[in-house]
């Protein structure tokens, strides 16, 4: 049972109480202080000090200072008044127990409120940090969008500048052609003047040299007229025999029918033009050429301006949808932009147009299979991707890069099967 401490001293003012409590040699670390508005307890085994205060105090602003084997309490009163005693008198044990329990409950409620306030503050801090992160990410996204927009505007300006340059070059060529025509016309006029002058000189000379007489004058006059008029050109015909195109295929592996069909399809594709497009009226002649648009798209692809390249290929396909290389090149752009389903569609369309399979279109078919297989693999459809890579290897078995990629896909498929 702890020993009650009674040798304490206290002083007061109207606003505060100063309590001095000796520790009796007990270590400060073993001292436990519990203070509420009506109750003060100091436990420093084997001693115990307990005070049921005369009036309520402000326990939050009250202080305790330990030094020189003594605890000095500064207890601030809630109401300014002088106390008759430090502890209330005439309190029985039941009343003391109620005061203790009430003080403990108040302390627990206060601790709970402090914990909840701390948790709420932590949530607010997390919410603020999340909002800051979202704001930073939004700024980064906007920055990236602005960079893309600036690149698009830059590419558009470059394209417009290139068009303007082409237009001026065409105008310059036209002016040069007109100047050459004017020079040729001047030369022709001068030649005609010289011919007229020579013919007049001959007429005068013949009149002076010829004997006088009607018959002789008529003979020479008719002769001069015949000399001055050139004879009509003779008509002839030129026969042209075109050399037939021969494919470099061995006779035992000859695919003459398929090769002829492929040539026929290529010729039809070059002739197939769709001119019923509203935008054509705003374009120059070279911009209406699918081949020119294809070359322009290739240049934009080389500069990593994939969106502008797709626009060029789109217009070329609208003009001529029978050219397989347009779909093949557009599939490469979609791969770079991660438009995987569109890349698969364009590769499949290119393979449809690259029929029948001949040596002349083998390289294009191999690229179409590789690009479609790459799109399948990025969609995690590794079995379909491997099928396309194996089809590409059948076309070009010596391609080391395709062999390595196909082996990697096989390893991925085998690893997936083992996990499952």
Swiss-Prot record:
The gene that this protein is the product of is: DNAAF4
Entry protein name:
Dynein axonemal assembly factor 4
GO process terms (BP): cilium movement; determination of left/right symmetry; epithelial cilium movement involved in extracellular fluid movement; heart development; inner dynein arm assembly; neuron migration; outer dynein arm assembly; regulation of intracellular estrogen receptor signaling pathway
- Spell out the subunit comment: Interacts with ZMYND10. Interacts with STUB1. Interacts with ESR1 and ESR2. Interacts with DNAAF2. Interacts with CCT3, CCT4, CCT5 and CCT8. Interacts with DNAAF6/PIH1D3.
State the function annotated in the UniProt record: Involved in neuronal migration during development of the cerebral neocortex. May regulate the stability and proteasomal degradation of the estrogen receptors that play an important role in neuronal differentiation, survival and plasticity. Axonemal dynein assembly factor required for ciliary motility.
Instruction: Recite the UniProt keywords alphabetically.
Output: Cell projection, Cytoplasm, Neurogenesis, Nucleus, Repeat, TPR repeat
What highest taxon heads this organism's lineage? Eukaryota
Q: Where is this region: Mediates interaction with ESR1 and STUB1?
A: 7-103
List residues traversing the bilayer: none
